[in-house]
Curated annotation (Swiss-Prot):
Domain of life, per lineage: Bacteria
GO cellular component: cytosol
Protein task: NAD-binding protein involved in the addition of a carboxymethylaminomethyl (cmnm) group at the wobble position (U34) of certain tRNAs, forming tRNA-cmnm(5)s(2)U34.
Subcellular location: Cytoplasm
InterPro entries: FAD/NAD-bd_sf (IPR036188), GIDA_C_N (IPR049312), MnmG (IPR004416), MnmG-rel (IPR002218), MnmG-rel_CS (IPR020595), MnmG_C (IPR026904), MnmG_C_subdom (IPR047001), MnmG_C_subdom_sf (IPR044920)
Cytoplasm listed as a keyword: yes
Annotated residues for binding of NAD(+): 270-284
Molecular functions per Gene Ontology: flavin adenine dinucleotide binding
Gene field: mnmG
Cofactor(s) it depends on: FAD
Protein source organism: Staphylococcus haemolyticus (strain JCSC1435)
Pfam families from the UniProt entry: GIDA, GIDA_C_1st, SAM_GIDA_C
Protein name in UniProt: tRNA uridine 5-carboxymethylaminomethyl modification enzyme MnmG
Keywords carried by this UniProt record: Cytoplasm, FAD, Flavoprotein, NAD, tRNA processing
Coiled coil: none
């Protein structure tokens, strides 16, 4: 008997987990298929979550009702807030994960989730009828039927591991690759590219001389990604910093001909922002040294990840490199680094919902879409799961805009501009980064999560209480006038401010660069009555109000352009005067509105003006008819 589901998710990595959970939490009967149940939520590369932009994505996933933030909060070995000396727009959390505990926690959550079944099996083929996906077929011939399918295959599609002059078929960390499904996608007509990524060697902690390295401790205050976390892990493990040197670089130079990167064995394009050590040596040969972070992979293992030493050089050369690095001269290598090539689809073949344009109800998320990183994968996964379930159940799909979330920036970049290399999310990619902060992800997206059925009533009530507290406190400070008495003047001067000449509203005093919310309380001789997160919002919203308002005005302009819809079936060959490149790009991407069209590479303002005139003429013609 064929088993039937609403949604099937292929893969149980970081994208697959969020897709499966989101689909199930929206009420869809969901099946998650994975090659190996023991490798759910596996971290084949770095043992960390978060970082600039990426850490904000994790917070956004949490605000939408996803799981990554909660899992890392329970299983990390270290957590740090980055860029604390800079403005709030670029601050972000980064956590070192206990890889095994993280897997165990995610597996527990998935197994306990209502509406979600998990099955070990390798999908070989999509079942397509009348250009619409209807299910999947495994390598042993088992069929599972569904109204929607989400593909989250990571680097498994025709995966090949490369080490020196060796190349063999494999998924990450020597798991089984997915070859037949990769062939199936090509046969269906998808445009496929070949990408490459890599991983560094792991060394034995017992054989590291830490006295030659610099300690990198975590923060000594409680940190969390999830807005719901109330218990913090303060017993943290440090990381350590060391560097390459001239001797390391000589080993690389002497053996560069053995690197798969430079021997021609690797054809795939690698990630620009995470280059291999041999790539760093070639591209930045003026640098006398490169940073290497020694990151423990967990509390109950001696494996240490050598961040920054990603390589495809032969194993014996990797050992030679390690022998030149301070602290690692006698380190035992437990696993060799390697490069991996894999198939990815060209992401301009997707709608902003992550549904494929070619086959209805088929969604893709994660590295199959050309991205790098666990967080980018999870962000796509939750949206693909939300939209697959919403379409099947008739409860609606959701597209996050570039002003809503970094997830919106990520997906819009992929489906509008495409990518010719593994895509990494950066703060510089977001034009509204002052709006898309680490601290306000819940204020931006909890309403969305609640409307989608992903947020519980209890959580939503707590969120609304927080939001009201912020509004009330800003209003209270707006109503209080501070007099320039001796107490006030002394507090202001002690905090580096200039004396008041006249009375001033508390809210206006808080706007001064040197003033903090704590300073205002000290002047008012009040104790802390509100949660720290509320106080933080009051201060940030007040200090950056002018800049925030300017960003919001820009957002309104873009929203007006987004309201100018473009018919999905518009024949661009009939739009006179469009530049040839613009016509080709518009036909390929099929933008949903003028705002998206304006972001397509090769479409210039003149093309947009022509398109606007054409659409207006079409409206007038329909009115006359």
């Amino acid at each position: 008997m064929v088993q039937e589901y609403d949604v099937i998710v292929i893969g149980a990595g970081h994208a697959g987990i969020e897709a499966g959970l989101a689909s199930a939490r929206r009420g869809a009967k969901t099946l998650m298929l994975t090659i190996n149940l023991d490798n759910i939520a596996f971290m084949p590369c770095n043992p960390s979550v978060g970082g600039p932009a990426k850490g904000i994505v994790v917070r956004e996933i949490d605000a939408l009702g996803g799981q990554m933030a909660k899992a890392i909060d329970k299983t990390h070995i270290q957590m740090r807030m980055l860029n604390t000396g800079k403005g709030p727009a670029v601050r972000a959390l980064r956590a070192q994960a206990d890889k095994v505990l993280y897997q165990q926690e995610m597996k527990r959550v998935i197994e306990d989730e209502d509406n979600l079944d998990i099955m070990q099996g390798m999908v070989d083929e999509l079942i397509i009828e009348d250009n619409e996906v209807k299910g999947v077929r495994t390598n042993i011939g088992t069929e599972y039927r569904a109204q929607a399918v989400v593909i989250t295959t990571g680097t498994f599609l025709r995966g090949e591991i490369i080490l020196g002059n060796m190349k063999y078929s494999s998924g990450p960390n020597h798991q089984l690759p997915s070859i037949t499904l990769a062939d199936n996608l090509r046969e269906l007509g998808f445009e496929v590219v070949r990408f490459k990524t890599g991983t560094p060697p792991r060394v034995n902690a017992k054989t590291i001389d830490y006295s030659k390295t610099e300690i990198q401790p975590g923060d000594d205050v409680g940190r969390a990604f999830s807005f719901e976390t109330t218990e913090y892990i303060l017993d943290q493990l440090p990381c350590w910093l060391t560097y390459t040197n001239d001797r390391t670089h000589k080993v690389i130079d002497d053996n560069l001909h053995l690197s798969a990167m430079y021997s021609g064995m690797i054809k795939g394009t690698g990630p620009r922002y995470c280059p291999s050590i041999e790539d760093k040596f070639v591209r930045f040969n003026d640098k006398p040294r490169h940073q290497l972070f020694l990151e423990p992979e967990g509390r109950n293992t001696n494996e240490v990840y050598v961040q920054g030493l990603s390589t495809s050089l032969p194993e014996h050369v990797q050992r030679q490199m390690l022998e030149t690095i301070p602290g690692l001269e006698k380190a035992d290598m437990m696993r060799a680094g390697y490069a991996i090539e894999y198939d990815a689809i060209v992401p301009t073949q997707l709608w902003p919902t992550l549904e494929t344009k070619m086959i209805k109800n088929l969604y893709t998320a994660g590295q199959i879409n050309g991205t790098s990183g666990y967080e980018e994968a999870a962000g796509q996964g939750i949206m693909a799961g939300i939209n697959a379930a919403g379409k099947v159940l008739g409860t609606g799909e959701k597209i996050l805009s570039r002003s809503d979330a970094y997830i919106g920036v990520l997906i819009d970049d992929l489906v509008t501009k495409g990518t010719n290399e593994p895509y990494r999310l950066l703060t510089s990619r977001a034009e509204y980064r002052l709006l898309l902060r680490h601290d306000n992800a819940d204020l931006r997206l909890t309403d969305v999560g609640y409307e989608l059925g992903m947020i519980s009533e209890e959580r939503y009530a707590r969120f609304n209480e927080k939001r009201q507290q912020i509004q009330d406190e800003i209003q209270r400070l707006t109503d209080i006038r501070i007099k320039p008495n001796e107490h006030t003047q002394s507090v202001i001067e002690a905090n580096g401010g200039s004396r008041l000449k006249d009375g001033i509203l508390a809210i206006d005093l808080l706007r001064r660069p040197e003033m903090t919310y704590n300073t205002i309380l000290e002047i008012l001789e009040e104790s802390h009555q509100l949660p720290e997160a509320v106080e933080e919002q009051v201060e940030i919203q007040t200090k950056y109000e002018g800049y925030i308002n300017k960003s919001l005005q820009q957002v309104e302009k873009v929203k007006r352009m987004e309201e100018k819809k473009i018919p999905e079936d518009l024949d661009y060959s009939k739009v006179d005067s469009l530049a040839t490149e613009a016509r080709e790009k518009l036909a390929e991407v099929k933008p949903l509105n003028i705002a998206q069209a304006s972001r397509i590479s090769g479409v210039n303002p003149a093309d947009i003006s022509i398109l606007l005139v054409y659409l207006e003429q079409g409206k007038l013609q329909r009115v006359k008819n």
